[in-house]
């Protein structure tokens, strides 16, 4: 496959969706064939699962149920949208991928990262981004951004405690340390233009390098902590 697979991660309110939109425009202006998608969602079945997972009324949802639903949505999304785009040689910008499950369900929910990885390993069948940009921000700042943004949907995860969101951030940081080759950390608390400039530089450096859509090394689940 000749496409590029890039994912973008971050706690709630980190601004990743805004960055992806700006990056899409930047790359299109330079002639790249770009596809933007999101998780959970991206295709009909996955969007239906998204509505179920993020529904604020389902506060009783079990952590394992949540993890399994995310993995199911991811599988369908991958097969219907991501793989065909990669086969067509497109640049895929994905708003969240498997690292979200590892950080949210594995770390913050306390299910265990190895356990959550095993579920997702079955779902993704070896497909991993060649680059993951993690937008790091203090959860208090991120949640305040959400409260101030009236256009953004407030979902079930937004209503979690600050302690939960602190654990999500801790999980992401551990993943970034474990997979330093793939995950690039960007300080998202800085001005928008500064964050965007670093994001562009990071993505362009990979576009000018290898065209592999996933790293075989990322399939090694022998050490997650």
Swiss-Prot record:
Cellular component, GO annotation: cytosol
Does the record carry Transferase as a key word? yes
Enumerate the UniProt keywords alphabetically.
Answer: ATP-binding, Kinase, Nucleotide biosynthesis, Nucleotide-binding, Transferase
**Record flagged with keyword Nucleotide-binding:** yes
Pfam families noted in UniProt: Thymidylate_kin
Write one Gene Ontology MF term: ATP binding
For the protein in the UniProt heading, the enzyme class is transferase
Q: Which reaction does it catalyse?
A: dTMP + ATP = dTDP + ADP
Q: Name one GO biological process term.
A: dTTP biosynthetic process
Q: What is its EC number?
A: 2.7.4.9
Which residues are listed for ATP binding in this entry?
Answer: 10-17
UniProt lists the family membership as follows: Belongs to the thymidylate kinase family.
What is this protein's function per UniProt? Phosphorylation of dTMP to form dTDP in both de novo and salvage pathways of dTTP synthesis.
* Identification of the protein by name: Thymidylate kinase
Gene that this sequence comes from: tmk
